[in-house]
């Protein structure tokens, strides 16, 4: 009788330190040759337990999905790299493992090495989920560099006649990637041309970094279906870059740029870009809290005829009145589409129409955007990002040098102490 295709210890809150601790919990997994998905999220694994689990995992050649989110809560920084290395080294032996979730684990500079090694080598990878890992820009550079190296390995394998999947999904939010890692991420996206889903929310990326990411990286993602960059900072500069590249995403279904400070000018620019009719599959627009005014809303209302699949637009927190004419036009158009959809999505309040407009602001007629910012040249923006990337790499080099020097300094102190003791005579 075949075993279950899913093995799960999800959310059990187990504290598994040693091989002996974990053995009773993975006996069923050990005996299951047909398992395709494992879920260990919500438990905490020590070095011994991770090593024992790794030995079992490397025998599961049918495994496709590994969920190791939140598996190091309460662990010392000195434990995590070794434990993680055991697990990820075993995953490298699995030819069908295409989805890996490592969210909610601390992978800063001190613990990133096993992750970076795995990402640079695991050719079968299709879907990578790295949310809330505390990377920071320096470790973010390393992760992006690893993905660029992975693209090279995938290409080399294809040239050897192997059937190799494209990397399709990167979810890397709440990681403080900032501007300092955007040049590296742009290179990674440019290398992985099969990307379909990108979610990089809440990363502290400013307009220069956003512009670089879009212009030099995601502009190469012709197969992109979902882009979520919410809660980063665009301003008119980033909105202009988005407007310039969005037409290249003919398969785009969902665009999330809420809480990104697109600005009034940016809202108008994006609406004009969408009105060109190059995004026929676009279904969802998330544009909340962006200072979009009535002109921007009017632009979206006019653009809807060029967006035949559009069903949901989120506009709360922007700068127009609830009785705005453009808003009414857009709402009516979406309502007509809902009526024509024969009940599709009717059980989901957020599937159709406009979101709840509870936090609208009045448009400030005296507010003037900085024209100089909107007219900044791309050369200046690229230079700024390159400077910040250099700083991130210098921080990384300094951190690595410090880690290498610590043992040497300790050894020197031990030697000095030994010399002093050797000179001491008992009287």
Where in this protein do the model-derived segments appear?
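Leucine-rich tandem repeat or coiled-coil scaffolds
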Residues: 1-427
């Amino acid at each position: 009788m075949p075993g279950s295709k899913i093995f799960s210890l999800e959310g059990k809150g187990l504290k598994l330190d040693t091989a002996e601790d974990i053995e009773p919990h993975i006996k069923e997994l050990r005996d299951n040759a047909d398992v395709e998905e494992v879920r260990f999220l919500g438990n905490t694994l020590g070095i011994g337990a991770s090593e024992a689990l790794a030995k079992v995992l490397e025998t599961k050649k049918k495994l496709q999905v590994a969920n190791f989110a939140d598996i190091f809560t309460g662990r010392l920084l000195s434990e995590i790299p070794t434990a993680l290395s055991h697990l990820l080294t075993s995953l490298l032996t699995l030819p069908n493992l295409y989805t890996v979730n490592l969210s909610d684990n601390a992978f800063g500079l001190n613990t990133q090495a096993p992750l970076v090694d795995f990402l640079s080598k695991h050719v079968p990878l299709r879907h990578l989920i790295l949310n809330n890992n505390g990377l920071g820009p320096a470790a973010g550079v390393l992760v992006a560099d690893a993905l660029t190296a992975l693209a090279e390995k995938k290409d080399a394998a294809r040239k050897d006649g192997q059937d190799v999947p494209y990397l399709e999904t990167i979810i890397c939010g709440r990681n403080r990637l900032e501007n300092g890692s955007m040049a590296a991420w742009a290179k990674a996206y440019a290398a992985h041309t099969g990307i379909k889903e990108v979610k990089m929310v809440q990363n502290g990326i400013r307009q220069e970094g956003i512009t670089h990411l879009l212009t030099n990286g995601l502009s190469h993602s012709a197969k992109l279906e979902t882009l979520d960059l919410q809660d980063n900072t665009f301003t008119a500069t980033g909105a202009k870059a988005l407007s310039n590249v969005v037409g290249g995403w003919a398969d785009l279904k969902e665009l999330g740029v809420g809480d990104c400070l697109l600005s009034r000018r940016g809202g108008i620019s994006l609406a004009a870009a969408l009105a060109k009719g190059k995004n026929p599959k676009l279904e969802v627009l998330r544009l909340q809290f962006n200072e979009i005014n009535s002109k921007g809303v009017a632009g979206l209302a006019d653009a809807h005829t060029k967006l035949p699949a559009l069903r949901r637009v989120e506009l709360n927190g922007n700068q127009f009145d609830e009785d705005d004419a453009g808003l009414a036009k857009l709402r009516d158009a979406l309502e007509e589409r809902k009526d024509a959809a024969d009940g599709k999505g009717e059980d989901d309040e957020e599937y159709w129409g406009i979101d709840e407009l509870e936090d609208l602001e009045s448009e400030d007629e005296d507010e003037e955007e900085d024209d100089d910012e909107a007219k900044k040249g791309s050369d200046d923006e690229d230079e700024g990002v390159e400077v910040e990337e250099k700083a991130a790499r210098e921080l990384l080099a300094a951190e690595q040098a410090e880690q290498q020097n610590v043992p040497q300094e300790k050894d020197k102190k031990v030697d000095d102490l030994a010399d002093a003791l050797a000179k001491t005579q008992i009287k």
